[in-house]
Amino acid sequence: MNTSMHTPGANATPSRPRPVLMIPVRRCGSHALRLRLNFNPQFFSPYPLHIVDFMPLVPLYGDLADDNAYFRMVVDVIGLQAASMVKWPDIAFDPVDVFDAIRDEPRSVHRIVWEMLLRAGSRHKAAVVMDKSLDSVHYADELMRLFPDMRFLNVVRDPRAQVASMNKAIIHEFDTLLNTQIWIDAHRRACDLLARHPERVLTIRYEDFLADEEQTLMKVCTFFGIEFLPQMLDVTRSVEANQIAKLSALWVSNCFSPIVANADKFKKQLSMDEIETIETLTQEYMRLYGYEMMTDARAAMDDKAFRIARSRSDIGKELAWRDLKERNFRDYTLRCYRADYLARVRAGLEATQGMSGQFNCSAVA
């Protein structure tokens, strides 16, 4: 990523909230935790921006030391937030204000995202702001350079249950092998981060949260330095939980207490061959996190298996989008709008960026 080093300013401001990133991969029960923690006014975690989807566009901006390029990135990232399925409450961002606030700091798309998060958190008088963009674990090193006080909440879930959930989610692949690989890549990053910075990372298991919500939430609150509140245990009172449950089937269960028996639901959702595939690839992490295996974990996989998996997933994704369009027009339209926004940003960058790398708006005037 292209960054231009400047003297840091806002990082050193003690009145700003502490930044926290939840890691490492979606469908781990992350919304359940976020929605409960949000009952504490000291804590603020809006619907995630998932900047990972913006990252392929970053090279198109060229040298971020160029004010023109960096300001345009600020405008586009703020636009991405506006195009998100769930809007952040009670705040609107002025690109000029955001740009002026961070122009003399290390330049990065992540600095823009976190300026927005920290401003939103400050507006809500929060002491801690958490980004639930779990995929940003892949950018943890840069985030720590930008924010030396950043902490990480590492949420682990049984890979068999998590992959079974990922297989049904339009945000992931529609194949067990491919989703298992995503799971491994994310947890490899998380484990590396934990090994190098153990004091910055708290690891919790989703299954432990299912078994004892109160103890798990108390542990997280202690790590964040905020107070545990009993109302965190009644998510049915969460306005946001009820709001997002109506938007997407992915979130419909978030306005209810989790069902402990669902931890083993993967046994009915996956074939034994799929379970063995997952266990073969993730056995190192399953042992590390204390999950018992059901197979000998000796599944054979080669390049052909991955090619078949890719083809199967592509077909499944196409069918899933068709089904979503028929089943839930709100979810479909909102997701398409965000995807269209990213496509428009890419098209605009490609159209206005001349051979010199400078932006030429007259090209599309």
Language model region names:
Residues F39, S45, I51, A161, ...:
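Active-site micro-motifs of SAM-dependent methyltransferase domains
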Residues S30-F43:
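A conserved segment at the C-terminal end of the G1
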Residues P17, C28, I112, D135-H138, ...:
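Short, conserved clusters of charged catalytic residues that mark active-site
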Residues V25:
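P-loop (Walker A) phosphate-binding loop of NTP-binding proteins
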Residues F44-D131, S136:
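PAPS-dependent sulfation machinery
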Residues F39, T222, R287:
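Short polybasic/polar patches that bind polyanions
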Residues N2-L21, I226-A365:
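PAPS-dependent sulfotransferases, especially Golgi type II membrane carbohydrate sulfotransferases
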Residues L21, A101, L117-S257:
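PAPS-dependent sulfotransferase catalytic domain
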